[in-house]
């Protein structure tokens, strides 16, 4: 049972649950102590004076480009296309915009329509004249399967994470999301967090070894059918990595975000105390 719970948590990083704005409000009010979060939001909150830090990273790039008709094979081929993107100014949008800017592709020549959430984007995608949608797994795979049922040819486009690595000269990974926690709460419950870390690692190993069973559990927590959960696992790039273990990769990502838009991090890179675990 615990195995599926871990998978559910991983999916939440891509926007399975509440919105990033709800997250920010809950931290500010002191209501939330342990949160799934896009990896830039924790830094932003800390730079605004909130006592939060990073516990771990749970995905190295959960968003996929899904296309209607034929695949959009490269970032340059986005020019002149209509693209649906959930969560304006949050992770899927940030990655797309930073990639376009780095490759000197005029963002004004890409027609972007924003959806409030990934499930809303899945709903809009088949009906209108959209060429592609950027979605976290398992919603990306769910939209591929949905296309089959309604007679629309939906295919994977270029790999956003690989394109990112090539553009920025980094490993093909984007530490997109993970768990952040209230600092005091973390230090007061250090032993429990150590157990939690091992439980998450065990859960991920179990999920990857028992995909069908994991999907049976996961479908109760995520807005996607069982086949999408099984097929979408590899594309979710799930991981369980303590912040300190992948600090170099995270800081490299933050440096890229600083060059693109410092406001995404609240104006500066995090201090060393940000990495709790």
Which residue stretches match the model-derived regions?
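Surface-exposed patches in mature extracellular/periplasmic domains of secreted proteins
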Residues: 112, 207, 214-217, 265-270
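Soluble non-cytosolic domains of exported or imported proteins
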Residues: 17-21, 36, 86-94, 119, ...
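Pocket-lining segment of extracytoplasmic ligand-binding domains
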Residues: 39-41, 120-217
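Short, surface-exposed acidic
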Residues: 107-110, 222-234, 265-271
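Secondary-structure end/capping motifs
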Residues: 186-260
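Short, glycine-/small- and polar/acidic-enriched structural segments
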Residues: 1-106, 111-113, 131, 137, ...
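Conserved C-terminal helix/tail region of periplasmic/extracytoplasmic solute-binding proteins
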Residues: 251, 255-277
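Solvent-exposed, polar/charged alpha-helical surfaces in well-ordered, non-transmembrane soluble domains
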Residues: 25, 29, 43, 76, ...
């Amino acid at each position: 049972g615990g195995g599926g719970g871990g998978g559910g948590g991983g999916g939440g990083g891509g926007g399975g649950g509440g919105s990033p704005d709800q997250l920010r409000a809950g931290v500010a009010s002191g209501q939330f102590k342990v949160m799934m979060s896009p990896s830039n939001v924790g830094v932003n909150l800390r730079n605004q004076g909130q006592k939060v830090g990073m516990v771990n990273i749970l995905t190295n790039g959960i968003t996929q480009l899904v296309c209607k008709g034929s695949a959009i094979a490269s970032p340059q081929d986005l020019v002149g296309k209509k693209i649906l993107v959930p969560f304006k100014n949050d992770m899927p949008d940030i990655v797309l915009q930073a990639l376009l800017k780095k490759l000197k592709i005029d963002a004004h020549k890409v027609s972007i329509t924003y959806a409030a959430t990934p499930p809303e984007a899945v709903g809009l995608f088949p009906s209108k004249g959209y060429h592609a949608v950027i979605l976290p797994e398992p919603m990306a795979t769910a939209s591929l399967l949905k296309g089959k049922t309604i007679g629309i040819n939906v295919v994977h486009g270029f790999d956003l994470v690989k394109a990112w690595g090539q553009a920025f000269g980094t490993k093909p990974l984007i530490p997109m999301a993970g768990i952040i926690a209230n600092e005091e709460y973390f230090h007061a419950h250090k032993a429990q967090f150590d157990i939690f870390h091992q439980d998450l690692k065990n859960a991920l190993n179990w999920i990857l070894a028992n995909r069908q069973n994991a999907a049976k559990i996961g479908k109760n927590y995520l807005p996607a059918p069982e086949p999408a959960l099984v097929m979408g696992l590899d594309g979710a790039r799930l991981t369980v990595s303590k912040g300190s273990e992948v600090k170099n990769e995270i800081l490299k990502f933050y440096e890229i975000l600083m060059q693109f838009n410092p406001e995404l991090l609240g104006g500066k890179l995090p201090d060393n105390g940000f990495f709790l675990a």
